[in-house]
Amino acid sequence: MILPLFPETQVHVFVYENVSNCAAIHEQLISQNPIYDYAFLDAATILYKKQVYSAIIRALEDRRDEQMKTKTIHSEVILSLSPKTEISSAFRQFSMTKKSKNIVVVKIDSKLTEEEEFERLDKLVEGNRVEFSDEELQKLIDFKVLKKNYKLDPSTLENPLASILSSIALRGYS
C-alpha cells in the first residue's frame, strides 16, 4: 500500500490469529535478526485500522523531520501507538510478547509486493492470516488492555477512536 502523504514509501500490514511461535519470534527480535525487521504488535491493543495507519504516519513524519526517538522505523511505529513518551513503556504496552496469541505485523519500506511479503512472513509466523480490517481487529481486541493503555473512561468507550487518535497525534506535546 502507498500512503498519500508518503508516495515513495511502500507499507504492508498483516494480521495473524492463533500464532503459536510468538516466543520464538520474540527471541529473534531481541537478537535483532534482520529477517524480522517488522513492527510486531499485539493485536489485543489494536481496535482500528486508523489506529495503525495513524501510528505509521506519525513514525514516517518523525523520520522525515529527523525526530525519531528510536533506532528503526518499525520501533518508531510501536512508540507512535503509545500516548506516553517512554520507549520501554510503549514496547510493554503495544509490542508483541512471548505470550501474544494474535498479532499485527507492519512492514515499511518493503521492496516486495504485498503477496511476496506475505509469503516471506508466512515462513516466520505460525498462525492464520486474517484480513486487516476493523471487523477482524475488533474480534481480537482486549478492551481491558485498551482502556488501560489509552486511559479511556466510560464516556469515551462508546466511541474510543477519537481519543485513541488524539493520543497518537499529541504524544509528547502535552
Swiss-Prot record:
Q: Name one GO biological process term.
A: tRNA threonylcarbamoyladenosine modification
User: Self-association or partners: how does it assemble?
Assistant: Component of the EKC/KEOPS complex composed of at least of SPAP27G11.07c/BUD32, cgi121, gon7, pgp2 and SPAC4H3.13/PCC1; the whole complex dimerizes.
Keyword Transcription regulation listed: yes
* Name of the protein: EKC/KEOPS complex subunit cgi121
- Highest taxon of the lineage: Eukaryota
Q: Where in the cell is it found?
A: Nucleus; Chromosome, Telomere
Q: Which InterPro entries match?
A: CGI121/TPRKB, CGI121/TPRKB_sf
Mind naming one GO cellular-component term on file for this protein?
Answer: nucleus
